[in-house]
Amino acid sequence: MSSEKKQLLYQVLKTISNSSVPVGSGFVRESLRLNGYDISEATVGRILREMDAEGYTEKVGFKGRILTSYGIEKLRELEHDHKIHHYGNELINVIKVTGRKNLIDILIARKVIESQLARFAAQYITRRELKEIEEVIKFQRIHVEKGLSIAEDDVRFHKLIAQAARNRVLDAALDLIRQHGQLSPVLEYIRKKVKSKVLLDHEKIFEAIASRNPEEAENAMVNHIENLIEDVEKYWNMVYESDDVNM
């Protein structure tokens, strides 16, 4: 099914779902018109009959149509796709506005600060804090397997390390750098596009901190941030190759 047909089906299903009573083709046509679709009532009638045949809707006498349980399930599926598409477009806009140079500058600053935070965390982390980080990695692994976002897991992982480092100045500096709320989702989007994986990096950082080896922890964090920088470069070469290199 084309994206245009999916969007139209989504709008029709949503219109029927939002109504507390069965709806007819005239009502659906007006709702579609308000959403920018100029479709005749006859065409809407044909679409509704096709939806009956697919099992998404059923007629209630002469009153109109309602959604079947299958139709409700289909609407949920399309709503999920709609949100992902909308969110993806938002992230693309954020990436364009932020720009390659700014993203890399942010990551370079993070490399300097977070490498030291990882080093200090390896020295001062408590058993309870180690357990918390381990739990974050466990949930991140589950989210990766299910194809869900790990942006929140990423923020939590790095914040726990910063807190375990017992250096309030570096912790505050990291908060300042990461105050852009879309930074983690943006980097996650870029990593997916270039087929990069962050979980392995996080596991290596955790192992170094858990073994209380400051040098290994610092190096693991440096490698992690450098991998992110490389992902940004790959993404820009792939998507904006013909644009200004400093975009």
Task: Locate the predicted segments by residue.
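Alpha-helix N-cap/N′ positions at the starts of helices
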Residues: Q7-L8, T98, I113, E135, ...
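Non-transmembrane, amphipathic alpha-helical segments
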Residues: T98, N102-D105, I125, K146, ...
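A short secondary-structure junction motif
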Residues: S19, L78, H82, Q140, ...
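Conserved amphipathic alpha-helical segments that form helical-bundle/coiled-coil interaction surfaces
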Residues: A109-R110, Q116-V186, H202, N219-N223
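C-terminal all-alpha effector/ligand-binding and dimerization domain
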Residues: R178-M247
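Generic hydrophobic alpha-helical segments
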Residues: V12, Q140-R141, K204-I205, I209
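Short linear motifs at protein or domain termini
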Residues: M1-A109
